[in-house]
Amino acid sequence: MNDIANLCELVGADVNMVRKGIGTDSRIGSKFLYSGCGYGGSCFPKDVKALIHTAAKFGYDMRVLNSVEEVNEKQKNILFEKFKNYYKGDLKGRKVAVWGLAFKPETDDMREAPALVLIKSLLNEGCFISVYDPVAMEECKRRIGDVVTYSQNMYDAVIEADAIFHVTEWKEFRMPSWGVIKKAMKDDPVLIDGRNVFSAADLEGITYLKIG
């Protein structure tokens, strides 16, 4: 679905409409047809790699799974690329907020999490980063130390920020007070939504960038 989302951006289509259309086919369904900023965790990446490796041992090229892995690694960079394109490469010194660190909600697991890829890219460009996750803060400290600022909550993270990255779809992030958030941020703020859960119409004038 991520490839479809990226194509939608190029041709001017809305991936959410495409997803709904595909999902009406009972042979497919709509439950897992969501684009995003990549998968992580301990199971799915390991299982895909194991299948590719096992097939290679027996001389078989798992072309579909190789493509899945390639697309996923590319997708983990998509939020940063949107940010870079939005500011036309002028990133040094910008402050950003990262909402969500774990690879999925309801866990502190950050193994192969998209947030780690994003944070590394932002640091390389000289950005100042405030992060917040309901349960993964200690795990993040263990992994990357004090190279980012650890915020008390989602509102604290956005103070004086140029941009927000929504990386993990925690329920806590779903219905914030956008008016409060906009006032706390710098002029012309932007939200880059890695899970496509928000609507531009609700954001009180915050620029909205989604996937697809």
Language model segments and positions:
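Structural/interface elements that position substrates and couple domains in central-metabolism enzymes
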Residues: 1-212
